[in-house]
From Swiss-Prot:
Changing P336S: Decrease in Fg-binding activity. Gene3D superfamilies: 2.60.40.1280, 2.60.40.1290. This is Clumping factor A. It comes from Staphylococcus aureus (strain Newman). NCBIfam families: LPXTG_anchor, MSCRAMM_ClfA, YSIRK_signal. Residues 40-542 are annotated as: Ligand binding A region.
Length: 933
């Protein structure tokens, strides 16, 4: 339904002459005097636009002129209801330029403008500004339609009009992905722009995002909103869709998936036509950046299509004029997509589905958020969940004590990551910290999506300081100086815009355990960037030259006329969205164990994204080896042992032993051991043993033993032995020991052994040992051995060890050994050790990713859409205008008349008197004429 102002006055030609004309005019003005002033200010009537109803050519068009004093247009939900005055809609029959702006509220009034099409304009006052980006240009094309108007992804269009202080006649409105399409019909000049059926369509296209619903602004990415055109999604051919990722995606290790598309464009496509790509709600296209952008599809150095993200998170591409001059256009597109932390909060399987039209791709992946880091009673994990490079800000979320352990005197510190050129600014002016208490650890989401309203804000109860440059410190001041529940720390900080480094942070938790042992645990956070790309090409199509006019032919519309939907799009865009797709993800890894052993681990991770992990280990080992051996052995040990032992022992031992033995043994063994041990031992032994052994062995043994032992032992021994042993054994053992040791041993052993062995052994041992051992020994031996041995051992050892150690050790060892050993051994061992240790390691992870998806786009678009709108209907003359239209166009530029307010009673009285006088004159003249006859 359209608003039209119809004012027609008919004059009857009678023989009564000038007097009757005068009387009729006076009577008409007398009756309409009180209503005319009102009509000049706000007179609209409603009329339905039926397809067969003829419209008058003198109908006026209502357009919009913006106020100049910081007028703003709202982007909030509004409905196209012309009865309640909520929405102001202004549309020209050719083009309407729409821009987004921010700041103040809007007050709208009406200004009549000459044209052929009529639209509805209502008043709108004090509309709040919710637009997040300024310099956002879009185009809307409205054609005349036959009893229907098609809307594709139409957003609210609001216009501001003012008859005063108006210096610009262009239409200012807000739109996102506006595409209004229609076809002309005979004798139809008014577009049905305010049909009530469009209300839901308008509302659905408006972004009303709550905090962290999606970590980007849809308004900000609609910088190149598509002009109106046809949705040709279902006309694309040779469509291919793919989801490229591993079976597992690690979002907190910069993990992402690639969405790949390919298609052919029909030759009938023209500038302004669009197609849609559906993106699943489990994915977003921004990662941790505050805004998301999609790459343009390029054909060499020309832009084939520009894309924006609509309010549902889907992507809409609009073709440029490249397709107007090309045939057989083909295009490919790749976009990085990230697991959405709000819609996927827990680790588990997720099915992803994306597509173009009826062609879709599905893939089920395991989303693994990985667990927090834990060291004894300390646990911590953090993530960088938002970056805004426009405002140079970031947000980091840290889980403190997510395991819910008891931590005494807990302290959290935040620093720049060591050995990096981090661009973070940490000080009181640039850093804001909020602390929340979590009553139940199960309430923590694994994706680190946090709704602060669900937790208790205890920021005022903790002590937050900045003791050193680029460092903050949070002390949890609880009544008993300990915490037993998780806490969430949210850090809002700033980035140095002049720094060339990346964002890299380290968070460290300190505290005592129940044994009053001070420990620390750290977690590092960094950011990786990824980018997408789009490409295409086509074959030049022939251009048909302009043909001469033929008699009776309709005059073609000039190409520079605003009624050509594709000729004056006026977009001069300069965008960087191809190389900067605006997606950031975080990679978090870190382990910090405080152990007094000396461990060094260097980890190297290679991921498809760019992850860089650096773990820091602090190890301190103190060993004192003083070996003083004096072996003057002149022994003639006539011991002829010929041992041929073939033992096959398969033992599975789990031993937790703490032994301090001082033994002097002379053994001649020929062992063939095949052991596979997986040891993960946790022993805390404090032993003080004093053993004095004196062994004198003179043996002549010939033993042939064949032992097959399959032992599974679990021993916990603390021995203080004073042994005097004389053994000559020949064993062949095949042991498979599985020991789990984590030793924290402080042993002080004093052993004094005196051994005098006179042995002459000729052993030919061929041992093939396949051992998997993890030994943690702490020995303090002071041995004084006087051995005279003449051994000829021929051992052939081949060791193939594959160890994967993850040790967690806290050892304080002091070893003082005085030993003198002379051994000539050739061992063939094939060991496969798998030890699980948590050590304090300084690991440097160097990952190489080519990703840059944080894009900054500069768009400067100039669109000119506002001409005389002289669209020539098929039944009109060539020039399309008559004298009345020209006069109306001229008069429309003049301001409205000052109607004022007259006294209605006086006016009616005057006109009544004049009408009476006229009537008397009329009757008198009739009588005179009658008398003459």
């Amino acid at each position: 339904m359209n608003m039209k102002k119809k004012e027609k006055h008919a004059i009857r030609k009678k023989s009564i002459g000038v007097a009757s004309v005068l009387v009729g005019t006076l009577i008409g003005f007398g009756l309409l005097s009180s209503k005319e002033a009102d009509a000049s200010e706000n007179s609209v009537t409603q009329s339905d636009s039926a397809s067969n109803e003829s419209k008058s050519n003198d109908s006026s068009s209502v357009s919009a002129a913006p106020k100049t004093d910081d007028t703003n247009v709202s982007d909030t939900k509004t409905s196209s209801n012309t009865n309640n005055g909520e929405t102001s809609v202004a549309q020209n029959p050719a083009q309407q330029e729409t821009t987004q702006s921010s700041s103040t509220n809007a007050t709208t009034e009406e200004t009549p403008v000459t044209g052929e099409a009529t639209t509805t304009t209502t008043n709108q006052a004090n509309t709040p500004a919710t637009t997040q980006s300024s310099n956002t240009n879009a185009e809307e094309l409205v054609n005349q339609t036959s009893n229907e108007t098609t809307f594709n992804d139409t957003n609210t269009v609001s216009s501001v009009n003012s008859p005063q202080n108006s210096t610009n006649a262009e239409n200012v409105s807000t739109t996102q992905d506006t595409s209004t399409e229609a076809t002309p019909s005979n004798n139809e000049s008014a577009p049905q722009s305010t049909d009530a059926s469009n209300k839901d369509v308008v509302n659905q296209a408006v972004n009303t995002s709550a905090p962290r619903m999606r970590a980007f602004s849809l308004a900000a990415v609609a910088a190149d909103a598509p002009a109106a055109g046809t949705d040709i999604t279902n006309q694309l051919t040779n469509v291919t869709v793919g989801i490229d990722s591993g079976t597992t995606v690690y979002p907190h290790q910069a993990g992402y998936v690639k969405l790949n598309y390919g298609f052919s464009v029909p030759n009938s496509a023209v500038k302004g036509d669009t197609f849609k790509i559906t993106v699943p709600k489990e994915l977003n296209l921004n990662g941790v950046t505050s805004t998301a952008k999609v790459p343009p599809i390029m054909a060499g150095d020309q832009v084939l299509a520009n894309g924006v993200i609509d309010s549902d998170g889907n992507v809409i591409y609009t073709f440029t004029d490249y397709v107007n001059t090309k045939d057989d256009v083909k295009a490919t597109l790749t976009m990085p997509a990230y697991i959405d932390p709000e819609n996927v909060k827990k680790t588990g399987n997720v099915t992803l589905a994306t597509g173009i039209g009826s062609t879709t791709a599905n893939k089920t992946v395991l989303v693994d958020y990985e667990k927090y880091g834990k060291f004894y009673n300390l646990s911590i994990k953090g993530t960088i969940d938002q970056i805004d490079k426009t405002n140079n800000t970031y947000r980091q979320t840290i889980y403190v004590n997510p395991s819910g352990d008891n931590v005494i005197a807990p302290v959290l510190t935040g620093n720049l990551k060591p050995n990096t050129d981090s661009n973070a600014l940490i000080d009181q002016q640039n850093t804001s910290i909020k602390v929340y208490k979590v009553d139940n650890a199960a309430d923590l989401s694994e994706s680190y999506f946090v709704n602060p309203e669900n937790f208790e804000d205890v920021t005022n109860s903790v002590n937050i300081t900045f003791p050193n440059p680029n460092q903050y410190k949070v002390e949890f001041n609880t009544p008993d100086d300990q915490i037993t529940t998780p806490y969430i720390v949210v850090v809002n900080g700033h980035i140095d815009p002049n720094s060339k480094g990346d964002l890299a942070l380290r968070s460290t938790l300190y505290g005592y355990n129940s044994n009053i042992i001070w420990r620390s645990m750290s977690w590092d956070n960094e950011v990786a960037f990824n980018n997408g790309s789009g490409s295409g090409d086509g074959i030049d199509k022939p251009v048909v030259p302009e043909q001469p006019d033929e008699p009776g032919e309709i005059e073609p519309i000039p190409e520079d006329s605003d009624s050509d939907p594709g000729s004056d799009s006026g977009s001069d865009s300069n965008s960087d969205s191809g190389s900067d797709s605006g997606s950031d993800s975080t990679s978090d890894s870190g382990s910090d164990s405080a152990s007094d052993s000396d461990s060094a681990s260097d980890s190297d991770s290679a991921s498809d994204s760019d992850s860089a992990s650096d773990s820091d280990s602090a190890s301190d080992s103190d060993s004192d080896n003083d070996s003083d051996s004096d072996s003057d052995s002149d022994s003639d040990s006539d011991s002829d042992s010929d041992s041929d032992s073939d033992s096959d022992s398969d033992s599975d031992s789990d031993s937790d032993s703490d032994s301090d033995s001082d033994s002097d043994s002379d053994s001649d063994s020929d062992s063939d051991s095949d052991s596979d041990s997986d040891s993960d031992s946790d022993s805390d032994s404090d032993s003080d043993s004093d053993s004095d052994s004196d062994s004198d062995s003179d043996s002549d043994s010939d033993s042939d033993s064949d032992s097959d032992s399959d032992s599974d032992s679990d021993s916990d021994s603390d021995s203080d032995s004073d042994s005097d042993s004389d053994s000559d054994s020949d064993s062949d053992s095949d042991s498979d020991s599985d020991s789990d040791s984590d030793s924290d041993s402080d042993s002080d052993s004093d052993s004094d052994s005196d051994s005098d062995s006179d042995s002459d052994s000729d052993s030919d041992s061929d041992s093939a040992s396949d051992s998997d051992s993890d030994s943690d020994s702490d020995s303090d031996s002071d041995s004084d051995s006087d051995s005279d041995s003449d051994s000829d051992s021929d051992s052939d050892s081949d060791s193939d060890s594959d160890s994967d150690s993850d040790s967690e050790s806290d050892s304080d060892s002091e070893s003082d050994s005085d030993s003198d050993s002379d051994s000539d051994s050739d061992s063939d061992s094939d060991s496969d050790s798998d030890s699980d240790s948590a050590s304090d390691s300084d690991s440097g992870s160097d990952s190489d990713s080519s990703s840059d998806s944080d894009s900054e786009s500069d768009s400067n678009s100039d669109s000119e859409s506002g001409s005389n709108n002289n669209v020539v209907p098929p039944n009109s003359p060539k020039n399309g205008t008559n004298a009345s239209n020209k006069n109306e166009a001229k008069d429309s530029k003049e301001p409205l008349p000052d109607t004022g307010s007259e006294d209605e009673a006086n006016t009616s009285l005057i006109w009544g008197l004049l009408a009476s006088i006229g009537s008397l004159l009329l009757f008198r003249r009739k009588k005179e004429n009658k008398d003459k006859k």
